[in-house]
């Protein structure tokens, strides 16, 4: 389903990238006196911010449209969250901290809740 892919990319994957790379890793670069490297990613952060405004509106509208839509979105979100977290864990643990990926997961879950989703997650 194209909307499942839309949700996976724009909410889950981009959510992890934003939190881990453009928040946590960027902050680490600043603490290592590498602010000039962090500045190189400014365009990507701006682009993801613009995309987020649009994709959040689309997801929020789809979730509010019907109970069936909300149920599907919740199922897709819950299924993809664990896979994406597992994919980012090795890098996040090596580059940042052991709990970095958990912080990113919580940020993505909070964003999903703001969009009207109610993910049925064991650890949330």
Residue ranges and their predicted role:
Residues 1-11:
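Acidic/His metal-coordination segments adjacent to aromatic residues that form catalytic metal sites
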Residues 14-95:
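Long, repeat-rich segments with strong aromatic
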Residues 82-124:
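C-terminal accessory extensions/subdomains outside the catalytic/core fold
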